[in-house]
Amino acid sequence: DYFAGRYKRNVPKANGNFGYMLTAVNRPSINREAYVQVIDFDFKPSAPSRFYGWVSQSKIKDDSQDVSGIGARLVATRGFSDQLFVLGALNYLDEDFDINDMGYLEENNKISLGGFLQYINPIKNENSKVSQTIFRVNGGHNRSTEGYSSGIGLNTELEFFMRDNSYISLKCDCTVMRGKNFTETRNFVDAPFIESLAKYNLQLAYYSPRTNKIRPYVKFGLGTDGYRSDDP
């Protein structure tokens, strides 16, 4: 048995909206019930600013357990100008937060903090071969609710848009700080300490000038990744 219902209301004075959703699953064949409640919101206090997210509670009940968990996601964005955009996000999913019965991927025992920055720089000098450059950086840090850190990751990208409509991209997907892969050892006390080694994935791409029929391009990449298992 499955049920899902949602209510949403606009709040003109706050330039936003909020909503509530209930999802319920009942599986008599295995005597299992699952409920998920979610309150979501999206507000724009000013033209360049936005604040949105959700808070959720899950409840699982069967012959072996009767537990509830809490999850939340908060995101704030601001466009400081036509050139600069910044985003910050915070996620919290406690140990007992379980939405797998709802048909989603299971994810819990996690606290994450992330950010995104984009800077667009148009080149006004018409003699320059570059018409515009864009720099993006996206970073994040994950930590289990027990305090295990999975490290700090950083993705950067620098793009060059040429006046002949060709395009050059430089990317780096890197691990700034190593940490424990606690997803692999979750809920297993005797599991080994699995450390995520430093990761560096570098990529260079060139796209030829765009035409109506075909656009050749070439990419070069170099990467390293891996794990190491030690006792805690």
Regions found by a protein language model. Name each.
Residues 1-32, 40:
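A conserved hydrophobic secondary-structure block that centers on an alpha-helix together
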Residues 9-14, 45, 160-164, 210:
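Short, solvent-exposed loop/edge-beta patches enriched in aromatic
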Residues 10-12, 23-27, 44-46, 56-58, ...:
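An acidic- and aromatic-residue-enriched active-site/binding cleft used to recognize and process polar
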Residues 34, 50, 54-232:
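Exposed, low-structure sequence patches enriched in small/polar residues
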Residues 40-42, 76-77:
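Conserved catalytic-core segments centered on acid/base and nucleophilic motifs
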